[in-house]
Swiss-Prot record:
Protein name: Ras-related protein Rab-11A
Chain positions covered by the region annotation Disordered: 183-211
Assembly with partners or alone: Interacts (GTP-bound form) with RAB11FIPs (via their C-termini) including RAB11FIP1, RAB11FIP2, RAB11FIP3, RAB11FIP4 and RAB11FIP5 effectors. Interacts with RAB11FIP5 and STXBP6. Interacts with SGSM1, SGSM2 and SGSM3. Interacts with EXOC6 in a GTP-dependent manner. Forms a complex with RAB11FIP3 and dynein intermediate chain DYNC1LI1; the interaction between RAB11A1 and RAB11FIP3 is direct; the complex regulates endocytic trafficking. Interacts with EVI5; EVI5 and RAB11FIP3 may be mutually exclusive and compete for binding RAB11A. Interacts with STXBP6. Interacts with VIPAS39.
PANTHER family, alphabetized: DRAB11-RELATED
Native source species: Homo sapiens
Consequence when changing residue 38 to P: Nearly abolishes SH3BP5-mediated guanine nucleotide exchange
Residues carrying covalently attached carbohydrate according to the record: 4
Outcome recorded upon mutating residue 13 to N: Abolishes SH3BP5-mediated guanine nucleotide exchange
Result after altering residue 41 to A: Mildly decreases SH3BP5-mediated guanine nucleotide exchange
Membrane topology summary: Lipid-anchor
């Protein structure tokens, strides 16, 4: 049973990055609306869509942002990355140049996004296996070397699209919830929370002194 879109426990912003034409918009539409458009044109500017999933009984609302990979849209970079807690870095398994550019996209992401952002490398268009130009093992090794998770997907036939988003959102949730638990523990152990106020009656030194020998 689905939840109302305005009822959620966590809201996570996830960005899609990578060269134009690698299938970012179709990954977004496949996950959020279960749609695929063969005539999909390059995204102009920025668009985002939302979908909620359940993790550990909590409702996670994913706000997934998509933008064109072409150089002329670079001006939106800072606003695009601001507040993002996850990123899918997408390349086309049938176009090696889109994989070569992953390193540049990763640098831009790390220059502009939060240092703790969760990143997944996504080899899209796995249905084009007969045209494969990027070996799976090569991409997986790159991901491991750079601390990224890795998956191959096909927005066309839906392969691993659900798994990609579920995996990154679950990882973000684990990190956020662990941080919340850690923060609570620190608060519980902080000196201010262990102080028991003690009322100390005024000592004789603090009592007002009675002046004597007046009016003599």
């Amino acid at each position: 049973m689905g939840t109302r879109d305005d009822e959620y426990d966590y809201l996570f912003k996830v960005v899609l990055i990578g060269d134009s034409g690698v299938g970012k918009s179709n990954l977004l539409s496949r996950f959020t609306r279960n749609e695929f458009n063969l005539e999909s044109k390059s995204t102009i500017g920025v668009e985002f869509a939302t979908r909620s999933i359940q993790v550990d009984g909590k409702t996670i609302k994913a706000q997934i942002w998509d933008t064109a990979g072409q150089e002329r849209y670079r001006a939106i970079t800072s606003a695009y990355y601001r507040g993002a807690v996850g990123a899918l870095l997408v390349y086309d398994i049938a176009k090696h140049l889109t994989y070569e550019n992953v390193e540049r996209w990763l640098k831009e992401l790390r220059d502009h996004a939060d240092s703790n952002i969760v990143i997944m490398l996504v080899g899209n268009k796995s249905d084009l296996r007969h045209l494969r130009a990027v070996p799976t093992d090569e991409a997986r090794a790159f991901a491991e070397k750079n601390g990224l998770s890795f998956i191959e997907t096909s927005a066309l036939d839906s392969t691993n699209v659900e798994a990609a988003f579920q995996t990154i959102l679950t990882e973000i949730y684990r990190i956020v919830s662990q941080k919340q638990m850690s923060d609570r523990r620190e608060n519980d152990m902080s000196p201010s929370n262990n102080v028991v106020p003690i009322h100390v009656p005024p000592t004789t030194e603090n009592k007002p002194k009675v002046q004597c020998c007046q009016n003599i």
